[in-house]
Amino acid sequence: MVEVLRSSTFLLLRNWEFTLAWIVFFTIPLVITPLPYVGFLAFFFILLFFNSTTQYFVKVLSKNEKSLEIKEIFKIKKPVFSFSLGESVYLFFTALLYYLFTKFYAVLFFWWWFYKPFLEKELYYARTFEDGFKALLILLLRPNWKYIKLGLRWSFIGLVLLTIAVLLVLSIAGVLLASFVVLLLSVVLAHFTAETILRIKTLA
């Protein structure tokens, strides 16, 4: 476990963008306001819920189960936890940096539309805490561009759902229901992400 964290840290620090984001995150916000840390925690828990839901739907769809046990979603497995932790750190820091360069939306578009379903595919095989980190790193180091076409259907549906969610959040009712909308959106997107994963032939 220590070796995985050490190698992962050295890998990320060699990326100047990540290093700069790390410096910005731990200096400026600490002096001005702790809100970015609160945002990071919220980001982590949203990803944790999403990843757990996705993995559950993959299991249900692959086994053609007729009934759903929603409580299983909240039984967070070790690889899902470590995967979500690594993902939230990497994505939050990267998004923070790109936000400074007005590229925030481009980062989210690339990550959620094309990368996310296939990182989830790798997570499907994970069984230990250490495997969760490996699942995150494998496609960051070796992206497979042929999978992009498989994510187009998921991307279109996700775009529609996100648009609806934004409109709700911008409305008066949306402000009151923002948390509910985020959870509902996570469940729906997780279902379609699971369908995308099952379309990938390498998932036996």
UniProtKB/Swiss-Prot annotation:
* Chain segments annotated as transmembrane: 21-50, 92-114, 150-172, 176-198
Q: Where does it primarily localize?
A: membrane
Presence of the UniProt keyword Glycoprotein in the record: no
UniProt-annotated location(s): Cell membrane
Q: Which domain of life is it from?
A: Bacteria
Q: Which UniProt keywords apply?
A: Cell membrane, Membrane, Transmembrane, Transmembrane helix
- Which Gene Ontology cellular component terms are annotated? plasma membrane
Q: How does it sit in the membrane?
A: Multi-pass membrane protein
Q: Does the keyword Cell membrane apply?
A: yes
**What is the name of the protein in this document?**
Uncharacterized protein aq_577
Provenance organism: Aquifex aeolicus (strain VF5)
Upper classification of the organism: Bacteria, Pseudomonadati, Aquificota, Aquificia, Aquificales
